Design a protein with these regions (language model features):
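A short, proline-enriched helix->beta-strand linker immediately N-terminal to the Walker B motif
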Residues: 162-168
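Conserved ABC transporter NBD signature motif
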Residues: 69-78, 85-89
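Conserved ABC nucleotide-binding domain
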Residues: 132-151
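Catalytic Walker B motif of ABC-type/P-loop ATPase nucleotide-binding domains
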Residues: 170-174
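Conserved catalytic motifs of ABC-family nucleotide-binding domains
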Residues: 51, 98-110, 177-179
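ABC-type ATPase nucleotide-binding domains, specifically the catalytic core motifs of the NBD
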Residues: 108-123
């Protein structure tokens, strides 16, 4: 919060977990999880093992509920079930295995399931994709079909899809194993 006359520099909190506990069966995996994610910030998280990482991502996707603790989504305290529902709508995961459909166009992958329309409008999709490319300074030399994209291009298209779907939290899950240092730099400059 700010004083009158001072510049407004309040960060918008997307997610806050205080004293969170996550269990797998009878085993407590996270005993005192605390996390704050803010709009416009990039946060790196390192895990001790793959089970922790998977449960954490599943929790952010709304597939695993906190066992105890407090959770705030968009600066409002929520019950665990409500938080999970909101997180399902607001979180995207981009990982080493692409979720893009290889047999359809890039444009269809970006807009088809994010649109609320009942019918495809490929002309509109092409125009919207071109606008996104221009707006975000993305190269025009990508192949038309997803199956012909490089790993970097797939990550970029998945980022565009998350952007178009207005996802508030985007998780990049182990993309460093997919991309060269140069490609990783290009992806992070887009972000």
């Amino acid at each position: 919060h700010y004083k009158q006359g001072a510049e407004k520099s309040v960060k918008r909190e997307l997610l806050n977990i205080e004293g969170g506990k996550i269990k797998k069966g009878n085993n407590v995996i996270f005993d005192d999880l605390s996390l704050e994610l803010f709009q416009g910030e990039i946060t790196g998280i390192v895990f001790d093992d793959i089970l922790e990482q998977k449960l954490f991502i599943d929790m952010l996707l709304g597939d695993v509920l906190l066992y105890s603790g407090k959770i705030f989504v968009n600066e409002e305290r929520k019950a665990y079930e409500e938080a999970a529902r909101l997180l399902k709508q607001q979180v995207a995961v981009i990982g080493s295995k692409s979720k893009l459909l290889p047999s359809i166009t890039i444009e269809d992958n970006i807009f088809l399931f994010s649109d609320r329309k009942l019918f495809l409008d490929q002309k509109e999709y092409r125009e919207r994709f071109q606008k996104l490319r221009t707006e975000l300074n993305i190269s025009d030399d990508m192949p038309h079909k997803v199956r012909n994209l490089s790993a970097k291009e797939k990550v970029i298209i998945e980022l565009l899809k998350a952007y178009e779907e207005r996802k508030k939290i985007v998780i990049l899950d182990e993309i460093t194993s997919l991309l060269s240092e140069k490609d990783l730099g290009e992806v992070f400059s887009l972000i």
